[in-house]
């Protein structure tokens, strides 16, 4: 408990909020180039081969990104747009690739939730 004198001299220090996506440096998205595209197994109760990409961002930082949706066309040297957002069962994966922009094509045959996977409206 500070004294009145201490409060006058130093004031109260505000708690700094720690960012969940530090590599983006406060930007909503960042462009990057795929260095490696591979798969990864999730944490304990789950079992799968999750698609991930190691991406070198335009600010020089290298991050591991998740590739959402079924199937993808990404390979080494593909240009991608990266956004924040972790994958709960993949440790160390704190970013996602935005589908439907740059070299990342949208998910084929997607009918619902298309905007999240960069899929165009199907012809009726």
Curated annotation (Swiss-Prot):
Name the record gives this protein: Small ribosomal subunit protein uS12
Residues modified as 3-methylthioaspartic acid: 89
Family recorded in the similarity comment: Belongs to the universal ribosomal protein uS12 family.
Quaternary context: Part of the 30S ribosomal subunit. Contacts proteins S8 and S17. May interact with IF1 in the 30S initiation complex.
Membrane-spanning intervals of the chain: none
PANTHER family (UniProt xref): 30S RIBOSOMAL PROTEIN S12 FAMILY MEMBER
Keyword Ribonucleoprotein: yes
Disulphide linkage map: none
Gene Ontology terms, MF aspect: rRNA binding; structural constituent of ribosome; tRNA binding
Gene Ontology cellular component terms for the protein in this record: small ribosomal subunit
Function: With S4 and S5 plays an important role in translational accuracy. Interacts with and stabilizes bases of the 16S rRNA that are involved in tRNA selection in the A site and with the mRNA backbone. Located at the interface of the 30S and 50S subunits, it traverses the body of the 30S subunit contacting proteins on the other side and probably holding the rRNA structure together. The combined cluster of proteins S8, S12 and S17 appears to hold together the shoulder and platform of the 30S subunit.
């Amino acid at each position: 408990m500070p004294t009145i004198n201490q409060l006058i001299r130093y004031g109260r220090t505000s708690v700094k909020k720690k960012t969940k996506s530090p590599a983006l440096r406060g930007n909503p998205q960042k462009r990057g180039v795929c260095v490696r595209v591979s798969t990864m197994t999730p944490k304990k109760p789950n079992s799968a081969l999750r698609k991930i990409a190691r991406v070198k961002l335009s600010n020089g930082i290298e991050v591991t990104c998740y590739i959402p949706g079924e199937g993808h066309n990404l390979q080494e040297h593909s240009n991608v747009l990266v956004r924040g957002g972790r994958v709960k069962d993949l440790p160390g994966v704190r970013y996602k690739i935005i589908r439907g922009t740059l070299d990342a094509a949208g998910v084929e045959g997607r009918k619902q939730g298309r905007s999240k996977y960069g899929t165009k409206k199907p012809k009726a």
